[in-house]
Regions:
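Short beta-strands within extracellular/lumenal beta-sheet-rich domains
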Residues: 68-79, 244-266
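Flexible glycan-contacting loops in extracellular carbohydrate-active proteins
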Residues: 153-185
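Carbohydrate-binding surfaces in secreted/extracellular proteins
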Residues: 127-154
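Short carbohydrate-recognition loop motifs
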Residues: 10, 26-71, 236-252
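A short beta-strand element within beta-rich, extracytoplasmic domains
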Residues: 84-96, 267-282
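Extracellular carbohydrate-recognition regions
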Residues: 1-42, 187-228
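Extracellular carbohydrate recognition
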Residues: 173-188, 331-332, 348-352
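Short, aromatic/His-centered strand-loop micro-motif at the edge of beta-sheets
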Residues: 108-127
């Protein structure tokens, strides 16, 4: 499996309201500004949203917490199923409280539901959905809970809709009994692709559960860059709040280098690493972002974001993911690993 996206929400400040008014459009806009791409739509009624930690059976879980008096549904659009099979994993935690239904459907794919019962006490389960599409256009999807098969479904999808299939997480009905509020927490997400074999056959590569950690920026170098408010660049890079300012990257052949905090792989259990850049495009319409990721002497290719439709009024996130060292098939070394990115603001015709 090739893991292409990771999301643990830990880059969002803890225990602070995500936005001022909890309308769906405001919440999605705030998630975009924080670089979240695995959740691209939502519906429902919520009274608060924050990144926080909850203890379930003495185990602390971290994620994005939605407080709701009724229901909330989060949507994740899958990669094109015509190109590969897809596996999506996430942890879904519901707080203690009388549940509205004894046989609810908290997870759906393309509108087709799986039964996912939760007890009245707090509970946290790790789910993985594996989906394939055969040559006749029929999608088969299986849901696994803590590695055990929880359900199957199938449906037809035309060729022009294979990149529009959504997984919905949450419920369109009340989650808790009438008149009661509770919390839904989503965390530790990943999305991966699995290559098709003969006749579009593919098998899941279940992980069971993962923990997505976060490495903040620890250092910055680059003489052609500055903070938009003339404040500390490192603080600005670690903060989505505009009060800390943003990095302004001037056109230059010189790379600006961002170094991240060490990744702990002392147990050799590192599955994947993702570096992401959230940015607004340059005022100059013929310029774009180019960037690479490296770890020590292992440096990946420079990616030029020529085709990204970013603008100066909204935030766009691009990412690079690795299941081995950035320059090839060399496994991650055990111990601490330090990653860095090199950033360029340059004409779109350069570094092709």
């Amino acid at each position: 499996m090739n893991i292409i996206n990771l999301e643990g929400f830990r880059q969002i400040p803890a225990n602070e309201g995500l936005c001022e008014n909890y309308y769906s459009t405001n919440i999605i806009s705030a998630l975009n500004e924080n670089g979240v791409t695995l959740i691209n739509d939502m519906s429902g009624s919520v009274t608060s949203v924050c990144r926080g930690t909850q203890a379930v059976n003495t185990v602390e879980r971290t994620g994005l917490i939605f407080t709701t008096p009724s229901y909330v549904t989060l949507y994740s659009t899958l990669p094109d199923l015509k190109a590969s099979a897809v596996q999506l994993g996430f942890r879904l935690t519901l707080s203690a409280g009388k549940k509205y239904s004894s046989s609810p459907s908290h997870i759906r794919i393309n509108g087709y539901s799986f039964t996912t019962p939760y007890p009245d006490e707090a509970a946290s389960y790790y789910y993985e959905i594996f989906a394939t599409r055969n040559e006749n256009g029929y999608v088969s999807a299986s849901l696994y809970c803590n590695r055990s098969l929880a359900g199957n479904t199938s449906f037809y999808v035309s060729d022009d809709r294979t990149d529009k299939i959504q997984v919905s997480i949450g419920s369109g009905d009340n989650i808790f009994s009438s008149g009661a509020s509770g919390t839904l927490m989503l965390g530790d997400m990943y999305c991966g692709t699995v290559a098709y074999g003969k006749n579009n056959s593919a098998e899941p590569a279940l992980l069971g559960a993962i923990e997505v950690r976060y490495s903040p920026v620890t250092a910055f170098t680059g003489g052609s860059a500055k903070n938009s408010l003339d404040k500390d660049i490192v603080t600005g890079l670690n903060t989505s709040d505009s009060d800390a300012g943003y990095l302004m990257l001037s056109p230059s052949p010189e790379a600006a280098q961002v170094t991240f905090g060490a990744v702990d792989n002392s147990n050799g259990d590192l599955v994947a690493v993702m570096a992401a850049v959230t940015y607004r495009s340059a005022d100059a319409p013929n310029n774009c972002l180019a960037w690479s990721v490296k770890s020590g002497s292992h440096e990946g290719e420079t990616v030029t974001e020529n085709d990204v439709q970013a603008d100066t009024n909204s935030w766009t996130t691009v990412s690079q993911s690795f299941t081995t060292q950035p320059d090839g098939d060399i496994p991650f070394t055990e111990g601490e690993i330090i990653f860095a990115t090199e950033l360029y603001n340059q004409p779109t015709t350069s570094r092709q």
